[in-house]
């Protein structure tokens, strides 16, 4: 089966006037992260950034058009893969250390970032070399 090229990796679906779903349709649904882009008045919000094998910023123009706050819902590998591409990042205090130092054993990539998570592999994928780049948060979130 032919691997998927970077230009075909992401899909965007407009859900409302200012809300867009971004996802990686070649990842099996159990592993797939829903990324959400919300257009704001002064800046935009991006909730989660997917696997990170291909640059989200380079291949989804929507996330590079305006200033953007990037939020991690949690720090599993399939939710923080491209956080390093965005300068303004935030995460809950309980997961800040993982975002800053995303070791595969902390992000569950050591167990789940395998060829089996894909319906079709992305070009250049090598599970043994998969790593998430550090993306320390500039802002910490708390309950309440």
Roles of regions detected by a PLM:
Residues 1, 22-25, 41, 109-112, ...:
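Short acidic/polar alpha-helix capping motifs at helix-coil junctions
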Residues 1-8:
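Basic/polar N-terminal segments that are highly enriched at the extreme N-terminus
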Residues 52-143:
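Active-site HxH/HxHxD metal-binding segment of metal-dependent hydrolases
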Residues 9-62:
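Conserved beta-strand hairpin/beta-sheet module of binuclear metal-dependent hydrolase folds
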């Amino acid at each position: 089966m032919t691997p998927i090229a970077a230009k075909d990796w992401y899909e965007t679906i407009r859900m409302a006037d200012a809300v867009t779903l971004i996802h990686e349709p070649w990842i099996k649904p159990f592993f797939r992260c829903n990324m959400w882009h919300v257009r704001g008045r002064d800046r935009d919000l991006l909730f989660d950034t997917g696997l990170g094998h291909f640059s989200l910023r380079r291949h989804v123009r929507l996330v590079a058009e305006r200033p953007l706050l990037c939020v991690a819902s949690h720090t599993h590998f399939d939710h923080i893969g491209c956080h390093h591409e965005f300068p303004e990042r935030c995460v809950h205090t309980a997961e800040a250390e993982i975002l800053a130092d995303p070791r595969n054993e902390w992000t569950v990539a050591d167990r789940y970032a395998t060829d089996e998570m894909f319906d079709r592999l992305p070009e250049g994928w090598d599970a043994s070399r998969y790593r998430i780049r550090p993306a320390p948060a500039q802002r910490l979130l708390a309950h309440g």
